[in-house]
């Protein structure tokens, strides 16, 4: 089966449904595994500052593999690349489940995730195009966030009950994702590789970086999404330490439920972006980005669970409205210049470098005993200022 799918097919085509289902299962496993592994390292009495180190090892794989994964995604059928990547995630989950070093196992999951990301987003541009691509990104983000919502909560609740059972569920879900990938049509390679030598691949990747960075629109998208996801992953770990201090709750489930509220909000915001923002009006999303930082600073001061839920829902809505148009812009312009897989690999490099830097600063702040509420306020203010600066620079460029 080697069809070239028409990009004018209905949005909810068989191919799109297969991609969305596979993505849901894979993202569910990622998020359940994170919270199950955090519970495991807490049980094994690792220090608090080691929690973000777990995620830093994960994102470091994205940075190291960035020159290679885009070419892999563009040189093979993307559905099969996604299947192999989910197989690597399954192997990492089994490493943790069978009692080996959790940092090693989670790093292996990171290798799978790094290979998976360019393929999962790049395939959207092969089965749809134009304004449908914004809507397809909305579906992808909604599927991902629904998986974050259910996976995070399931991981936290199962870990409170039985940590090994939680890890086993993650392995089963990854196995289901591998099977789901078999139903994605085998599409022709988008940009077959010229060379597979590491030097040539690295040179080609950095050439793609230069091409995208010189384009004002894609540079704008790269910076915006990098700031957003760097902030998002840091907020996740902030919640783990903030909940016991601000709310006096010490279980594993509450931080996952709070993260779930962000997920619900992103689904709503992604839907609003698909309705009100087009590729020609991407700058409409920028005020939402600034308000994310303001809302995070206000959130850090809360002392009641209801207010925390409400503010995190608002943060999620703003986040979905902010990031979906930027993703679509990069994919649309990137697929015509360097290939969708390479464009997403460059985006992953930026996003994960931002994550690594922000998590490193957060881990340092925790290690030197900066109050977690103060960390939250400072984090929100700096994010709002960064997005404001990005917006002003884009307006001046126009």
Swiss-Prot record:
<keyword id="KW-0472">Membrane</keyword>
<feature type="transmembrane region" description="Helical">
    <location>
        <begin position="139"/>
        <end position="159"/>
    </location>
</feature>
<keyword id="KW-1133">Transmembrane helix</keyword>
<dbReference type="InterPro" id="IPR023727">
    <property type="entry name" value="LysoPLipid__transptr_LplT"/>
</dbReference>
<dbReference type="Pfam" id="PF07690">
    <property type="entry name" value="MFS_1"/>
</dbReference>
<dbReference type="InterPro" id="IPR011701">
    <property type="entry name" value="MFS"/>
</dbReference>
<dbReference type="GO" id="GO:0051978">
    <property type="term" value="F:lysophospholipid:sodium symporter activity"/>
</dbReference>
<feature type="transmembrane region" description="Helical">
    <location>
        <begin position="53"/>
        <end position="73"/>
    </location>
</feature>
<keyword id="KW-0813">Transport</keyword>
<protein>
    <recommendedName>
        <fullName>Lysophospholipid transporter LplT</fullName>
    </recommendedName>
</protein>
<comment type="similarity">
    <text>Belongs to the major facilitator superfamily. LplT (TC 2.A.1.42) family.</text>
</comment>
<dbReference type="GO" id="GO:0005886">
    <property type="term" value="C:plasma membrane"/>
</dbReference>
<feature type="transmembrane region" description="Helical">
    <location>
        <begin position="163"/>
        <end position="183"/>
    </location>
</feature>
<feature type="transmembrane region" description="Helical">
    <location>
        <begin position="16"/>
        <end position="36"/>
    </location>
</feature>
<keyword id="KW-0445">Lipid transport</keyword>
<keyword id="KW-0812">Transmembrane</keyword>
<feature type="transmembrane region" description="Helical">
    <location>
        <begin position="253"/>
        <end position="273"/>
    </location>
</feature>
<feature type="transmembrane region" description="Helical">
    <location>
        <begin position="195"/>
        <end position="213"/>
    </location>
</feature>
<feature type="transmembrane region" description="Helical">
    <location>
        <begin position="286"/>
        <end position="306"/>
    </location>
</feature>
<dbReference type="InterPro" id="IPR036259">
    <property type="entry name" value="MFS_trans_sf"/>
</dbReference>
<feature type="transmembrane region" description="Helical">
    <location>
        <begin position="310"/>
        <end position="330"/>
    </location>
</feature>
<feature type="transmembrane region" description="Helical">
    <location>
        <begin position="91"/>
        <end position="111"/>
    </location>
</feature>
<feature type="transmembrane region" description="Helical">
    <location>
        <begin position="227"/>
        <end position="247"/>
    </location>
</feature>
<keyword id="KW-1003">Cell membrane</keyword>
<feature type="transmembrane region" description="Helical">
    <location>
        <begin position="372"/>
        <end position="392"/>
    </location>
</feature>
<keyword id="KW-0997">Cell inner membrane</keyword>
<feature type="transmembrane region" description="Helical">
    <location>
        <begin position="344"/>
        <end position="364"/>
    </location>
</feature>
<comment type="function">
    <text>Catalyzes the facilitated diffusion of 2-acyl-glycero-3-phosphoethanolamine (2-acyl-GPE) into the cell.</text>
</comment>
């Amino acid at each position: 089966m080697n069809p070239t799918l028409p990009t004018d097919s209905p949005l909810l085509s068989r191919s799109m449904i297969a991609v969305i289902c596979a993505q849901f299962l894979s993202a569910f496993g990622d998020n359940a595994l994170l919270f199950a592994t955090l519970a495991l390292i807490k049980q094994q009495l690792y220090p608090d500052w080691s929690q973000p180190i777990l995620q830093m090892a994960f994102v470091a794989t994205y940075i190291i593999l960035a020159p290679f994964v885009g070419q892999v995604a563009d040189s093979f059928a993307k559905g099969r690349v996604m299947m192999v990547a989910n197989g690597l995630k399954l192997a990492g989950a089994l490493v943790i489940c069978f009692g080996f070093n959790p940092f090693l196992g989670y790093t292996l999951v990171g290798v799978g995730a790094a290979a998976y990301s360019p393929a999962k987003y790049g395939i959207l541009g092969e089965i749809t195009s134009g304004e449908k691509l914004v809507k397809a990104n909305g579906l992808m983000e909604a599927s991902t966030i629904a998986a974050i919502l259910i996976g995070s909560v399931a991981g936290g609740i199962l870990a409170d009950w039985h940590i090994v059972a939680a890890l086993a569920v993650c392995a089963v879900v990854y196995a289901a994702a591998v099977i789901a990938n078999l139903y994605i049509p085998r599409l022709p390679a988008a940009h077959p590789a010229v060379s597979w030598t590491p030097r040539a691949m690295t040179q080609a990747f950095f050439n793609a970086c230069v091409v995208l960075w010189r384009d004002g629109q894609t540079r704008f998208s790269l910076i915006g999404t990098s700031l957003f996801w760097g902030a998002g992953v840091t907020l996740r770990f902030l919640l783990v330490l903030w909940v016991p201090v601000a709310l006096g709750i010490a279980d594993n489930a509450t931080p996952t439920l709070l993260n779930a509220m962000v997920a619900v909000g992103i689904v709503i915001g992604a839907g609003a972006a698909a309705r009100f923002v087009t590729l020609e009006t991407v700058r409409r999303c920028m005020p939402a980005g600034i308000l994310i930082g303001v809302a995070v600073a206000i959130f850090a001061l809360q002392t009641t669970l209801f207010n925390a839920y409400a503010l995190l829902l608002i943060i999620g809505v703003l986040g979905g409205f902010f990031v979906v148009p930027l993703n679509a812009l990069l994919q649309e312009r990137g697929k015509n210049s360097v290939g969708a897989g390479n464009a997403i690999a460059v985006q992953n490099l930026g996003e994960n470098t931002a994550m690594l830097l922000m998590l490193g600063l957060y881990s340092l702040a925790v290690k030197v005993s900066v109050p977690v509420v103060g960390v939250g306020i400072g984090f929100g203010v700096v994010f709002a200022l960064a997005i404001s600066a990005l917006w002003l620079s884009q307006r001046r460029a126009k």
